[in-house]
């Protein structure tokens, strides 16, 4: 392939990973264009926000990097798509007693959909990000493998990628360790080489999702009852959006023993509390399942699966069901299987796919 003429649009957040991704692709001979996705919603909030991946300083950092490595740079507006597919979804899920994963939604609907559409409209061949994952082509099919840096691997949030998207996506950081990426940034004189990684949800800098939803929809967030599994009232909660399955801290209720959120009932506006054993389970059903090495699961398959980002995958068997659903049976009990979160499947370092826990 003559990549000299191949153009790539790099999503630049102002952080070290996407900055080095742009540099590496330029070094490989691509014609690189940098872009920051404008997703912030109202200007006051945006101006006050500092250091997140969608703050003014992030745009300034990305622009400075683009100038330094000698590539054109643009700010592209994805405000409406982000509000609809990420923020509204995020709020709706919490209102329904589920715990959403906004990064999974953003990857699915914004970075590898709206952003890719924009690139193609502009006649650009590829999009690229600073994600830690490896995309390879094998037997006429694109596959995704875990990155070289186990601690930074981001495949958990990439299970929705389609063959169409994978064919047009580059992730050069996947073959490096984070320390090497920082070293490259330092070597080429990027000020962001020691910029700390953003941990929070980009549109909720203080990580208080309950407060965020309450501020926007005060009438929808109502107090209700904490109950036990038999329905006996234990106390008052401040609104179901403040809680997630497995939560123990911040319940503001003293019952003489550790209690955990074991269920949330949006219809009765109740938060069910129980003990640690009530949180342990070996089975779940997932919907909206996407597979990467193949189109559909035909028969039960042994995999390693994980139900949260930072977890080490556990042995499980996945069994196909109707309507793009899958049953997941773990060998060992899992703690706090949470509706709305993603379950993701692997075979060694190969990403098999994933879905949303029902």
From Swiss-Prot:
CDD domains noted in UniProt: MnmA_TRMU-like
Cited Pfam families: tRNA_Me_trans (PF03054), tRNA_Me_trans_C (PF20258), tRNA_Me_trans_M (PF20259)
Active site location: 106 (nucleophile), 202 (cysteine persulfide intermediate)
The name this protein goes by in its record: tRNA-specific 2-thiouridylase MnmA 2
Coiled-coil regions listed in the entry: none
Catalytic activity: S-sulfanyl-L-cysteinyl-[protein] + uridine(34) in tRNA + AH2 + ATP = 2-thiouridine(34) in tRNA + L-cysteinyl-[protein] + A + AMP + diphosphate + H(+)
Region (Interaction with tRNA): 152-154, 308-309
EC number(s) given by UniProt: 2.8.1.13
Described purpose of this protein according to its UniProt entry: Catalyzes the 2-thiolation of uridine at the wobble position (U34) of tRNA, leading to the formation of s(2)U34.
Binding of ATP, residues: 11-18, 37, 130
Residue ranges crossing the lipid bilayer per the database entry: none
Record-level Gene Ontology MF annotations: ATP binding; tRNA binding; tRNA-uridine 2-sulfurtransferase activity
């Amino acid at each position: 392939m003559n990549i000299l003429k191949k153009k790539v649009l790099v999503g630049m957040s102002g952080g070290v990973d996407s900055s080095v991704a742009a540099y590496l692709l330029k070094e490989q001979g691509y014609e690189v264009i940098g872009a920051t996705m404008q997703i912030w919603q109202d200007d006051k909030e945006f101006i006050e926000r500092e250091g997140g991946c969608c703050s003014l300083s992030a745009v300034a950092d990305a622009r400075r990097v683009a100038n330094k490595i000698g590539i054109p740079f643009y700010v592209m507006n994805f405000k409406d798509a982000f509000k609809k597919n990420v923020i509204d979804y995020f709020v709706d899920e919490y209102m329904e007693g589920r715990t959403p994963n906004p990064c999974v939604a953003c990857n699915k609907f914004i970075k590898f959909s709206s952003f890719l559409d924009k690139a193609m409209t502009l006649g650009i061949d590829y999009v690229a990000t600073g994600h830690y994952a490896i995309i390879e082509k094998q037997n006429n099919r694109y596959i995704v493998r875990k990155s070289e840096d186990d601690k930074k691997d981001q495949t958990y949030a990439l299970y929705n990628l389609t063959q169409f998207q994978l064919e047009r996506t580059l992730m050069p950081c996947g073959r490096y360790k984070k320390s090497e990426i920082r070293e490259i940034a330092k070597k080429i004189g990027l000020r962001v080489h020691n910029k700390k990684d953003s941990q929070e949800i980009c549109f909720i800098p203080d990580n208080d999702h309950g407060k965020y939803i309450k501020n926007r929809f005060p009438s929808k967030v109502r107090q209700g009852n904490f109950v036990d599994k038999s329905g006996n009232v234990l106390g008052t909660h401040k609104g179901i959006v403040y809680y997630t399955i497995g939560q123990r801290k911040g319940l503001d209720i003293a019952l003489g023993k550790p209690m955990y959120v074991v269920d949330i009932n949006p219809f009765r506006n109740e938060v069910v509390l129980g003990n640690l054993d009530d949180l342990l389970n070996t089975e779940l059903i997932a919907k909206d399942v996407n597979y990467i090495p193949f189109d559909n699961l035909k028969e039960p398959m042994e995999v390693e699966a994980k139900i949260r980002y930072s977890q080490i995958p556990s042995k499980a068997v996945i069994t196909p069901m109707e309507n793009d659903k899958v049953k997941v049976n773990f060998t060992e009990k899992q703690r706090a299987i949470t509706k709305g979160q993603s379950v993701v499947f692997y075979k060694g370092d190969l990403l098999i796919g994933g879905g949303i826990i029902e």
